[in-house]
């Protein structure tokens, strides 16, 4: 089957829904695609299309980050529906790391919950630059004053995590009521109060979330999110291009986790359409020649040859989450071995030493809420570089978040 070409007419942005479990992220994603489909901008996706993996349907929660595409009057969006269940924050980290902006979904009936706060913190740590809030389930709240109190609480929470809480737009609506209106046969879709709230939300996203300046000048790099094998054609690696650009026919290196290996790009696709060239910000599938499926895995990066090296040993500045932020309840010591989440990989690391952030004195014990410097040795080499952000997790909790300051050469 011949695929059509991807036409680059409108600016492309990566956006996502974040927030607490059952606050309505996936329902809102479905409502957005349905509302924009009415205007002829996209194909409608229902809730079950987005909530696609079998274990998601069985438990009614989103596990893998799900990608959909849609357009507004002025932009083309790739939308990632981020998981809300505590066990699956690692996928949320992968999804958030790909976002140019986020829609924070908060139930008007419940207000901000522990995962709401954790997702805001993670969004800040992985560099999501702008957030718009959708205050959902407004149809379940009769008291306007209660919704105003929830708005204030959301603003305070955002400000706590260094987002401009008082400036961030908050759109109040009901994703499920809008979705029901959009799927009903005899309801006027345009002009419906709840559907209009979805259009208001997307107009706000268009206006408030800035079009990012893509980092196309630096050497190409893409963290691999998934790998599939196509019989007779080769191996496809999918992910978001972090920086640079790449064309069919060019050579790339596979870096991290295993021995570094070269491959030739024989095809590029985005949303089932072919590309000759892919640039920073694109969510692409890259067809690779000379690579077997077992030689490549999620967590590796594809990069311009010799532009990035695998390392195991680094120093970093780290913030250790408080108990109220979903972090540890107790202190820990040198020798602690949590998981380090970097781009799309997670690998166990041995924390060798701690130092105070300000005075550089050696510390024996670290408490929740501390800001420290630490030296880490990973059990496997991965593609890391200075100024790169990461999260630290243990037993289903985000323990800390940090940034690499120094690579320690072996």
UniProtKB/Swiss-Prot annotation:
Q: Which reaction does it catalyse?
A: GTP + H2O = GDP + phosphate + H(+)
Q: Name one GO molecular function term.
A: translation elongation factor activity
Question: Per the database entry, which stretches of residues form a coiled coil?
Answer: none
A family per Pfam:
GTP_EFTU_D3
Q: Where is this region: G1?
A: 19-26
User: What broad class of enzyme is this?
Assistant: hydrolase
Where are the residues of the annotated region G3?
Answer: 81-84
One GO process term, biological-process aspect: mitochondrial translational elongation
G2: region residues = 60-64
Which residues lie within the region annotated G5?
A: 174-176
Residue intervals of the tr-type G domain: 10-213
Question: So what EC number does this one have?
Answer: 3.6.5.3
Q: Annotated region G4: where?
A: 136-139
The listed locations are: Plastid, Chloroplast
Annotated residues for binding of Mg(2+): 26
InterPro entries on file: EF-Tu_GTP-bd, EF-Tu_GTPase, EFTu-like_2, EFTU_2, G_TR_CS, P-loop_NTPase, Small_GTP-bd, T_Tr_GTP-bd_dom
Q: Which family does it belong to?
A: Belongs to the TRAFAC class translation factor GTPase superfamily. Classic translation factor GTPase family. EF-Tu/EF-1A subfamily.
Give the protein's biological function.
Answer: GTP hydrolase that promotes the GTP-dependent binding of aminoacyl-tRNA to the A-site of ribosomes during protein biosynthesis.
- The protein here is known as Elongation factor Tu, chloroplastic
Q: What is the lineage of its organism?
A: Eukaryota, Viridiplantae, Chlorophyta, Ulvophyceae, TCBD clade
């Amino acid at each position: 089957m011949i695929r059509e070409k991807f036409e680059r007419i409108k600016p492309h942005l990566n956006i996502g829904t974040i927030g607490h479990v059952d606050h309505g992220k996936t329902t809102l994603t479905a409502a957005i695609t349905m509302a924009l489909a009415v205007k002829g901008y996209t194909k409608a996706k229902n809730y079950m299309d987005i909530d696609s993996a079998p274990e998601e349907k069985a438990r009614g929660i989103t596990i893998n980050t799900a990608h959909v595409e849609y357009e507004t009057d002025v932009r083309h969006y790739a939308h990632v529906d981020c998981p809300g269940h505590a066990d699956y924050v690692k996928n949320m980290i992968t999804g958030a790391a790909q976002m140019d902006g986020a829609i924070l979904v908060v139930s008007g009936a419940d207000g901000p919950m522990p995962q709401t706060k954790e997702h805001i913190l993670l969004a800040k740590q992985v560099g999501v630059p702008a957030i718009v809030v959708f205050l959902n389930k407004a149809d379940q709240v009769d008291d306007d004053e209660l919704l105003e109190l929830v708005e204030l609480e959301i603003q305070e929470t955002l400000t706590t995590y260094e987002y401009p809480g008082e400036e961030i737009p908050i759109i109040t609506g009901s994703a499920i009521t809008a979705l029901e209106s959009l799927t009903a046969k005899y309801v006027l879709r345009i002009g419906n109060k709840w559907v209009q709230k979805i259009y208001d939300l997307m107009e706000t996203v268009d206006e408030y979330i800035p079009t990012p300046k893509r980092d196309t000048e630096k050497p190409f790099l893409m963290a691999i999110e998934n790998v599939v094998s196509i019989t007779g054609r080769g191996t496809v690696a999918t992910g978001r291009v972090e920086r640079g650009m790449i064309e069919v026919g060019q050579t790339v290196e596979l870096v991290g986790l295993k021995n570094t290996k070269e491959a030739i790009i024989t095809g590029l696709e985005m949303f089932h359409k072919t590309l000759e060239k892919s640039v920073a910000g694109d969510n692409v599938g890259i067809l690779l020649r000379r690579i077997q499926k077992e030689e490549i895995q999620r967590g590796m990066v594809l990069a311009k040859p010799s532009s990035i090296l695998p390392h195991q040993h680094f120093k970093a500045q780290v913030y250790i989450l408080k108990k109220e932020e979903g972090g540890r309840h107790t202190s820990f010591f040198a020798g602690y071995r949590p998981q380090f989440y970097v781009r799309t990989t997670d690998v166990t690391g041995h924390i060798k030493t701690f130092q105070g952030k300000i005075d550089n004195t050696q510390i024996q014990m670290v408490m929740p809420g501390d800001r420290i410097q630490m030296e880490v040795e990973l059990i496997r080499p991965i593609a890391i570089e200075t100024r790169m952000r990461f999260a630290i997790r243990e037993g289903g909790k985000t323990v800390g978040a940090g940034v690499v300051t120094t690579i320690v050469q072996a």
